[in-house]
């Protein structure tokens, strides 16, 4: 990921955490994921440039998940996130708290609208509700294909687009920054 994309990802995380006050990282990941789908469906562009991968509990932004868990191949992203949030305590090691306000200059109004809508729809859902909501046919196909194989199971943008019936001509104004090719890691 380019530095700008990492900064946007961190500011997106902070935006959601500032709006909610605190969130467990599973709910945070799903809230951002569903905002990505909303923004893609309406505008033909994603909010972040992170890879979306099929994991056992549904699709996730993979670089963000790895960085949150301290398992990142992106040390710069990990450092940036450490200065942006903290975990609540040892007893609540999955609850994230913001350490500063988000720099909203990194987000467009349409991106903030998609994030706000996703926060309203998803931030109060249980783990099970979020898991069920995110387990669709595309996730299942990618997860089955990649199960047990390191580096497989990532969704492609084409598959995400097809879910929302976008064609190449619908997305002609997109850029690689907004909608990257999502390679298998």
Range-by-range predicted roles:
Residues 1-185:
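Domain-edge interaction signal
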């Amino acid at each position: 990921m380019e530095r700008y994309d990492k900064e946007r990802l961190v500011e997106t995380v902070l935006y959601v955490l500032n709006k909610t006050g605190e969130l467990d990282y599973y709910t945070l990941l799903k809230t951002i994921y569903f905002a990505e789908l909303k923004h893609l469906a309406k505008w033909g562009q994603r909010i972040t440039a992170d890879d979306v991968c099929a994991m056992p509990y549904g699709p996730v932004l993979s670089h963000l998940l790895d960085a949150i868990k301290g398992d990142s191949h992106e040390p710069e992203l990990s450092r940036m996130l450490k200065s942006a949030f903290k975990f609540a305590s040892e007893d609540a090691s999955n609850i994230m708290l913001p350490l500063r306000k988000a720099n909203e200059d990194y987000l467009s109004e349409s991106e903030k609208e998609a994030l706000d809508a996703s926060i309203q729809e998803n931030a109060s859902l249980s783990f099970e509700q979020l898991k069920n909501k995110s387990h669709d046919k595309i996730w299942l196909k990618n997860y089955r294909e990649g199960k047990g194989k390191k580096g497989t199971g990532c969704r492609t943008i084409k598959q995400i687009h097809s879910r929302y019936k976008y064609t190449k001509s619908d997305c002609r104004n997109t850029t690689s920054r907004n909608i990257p090719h999502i390679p298998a890691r």
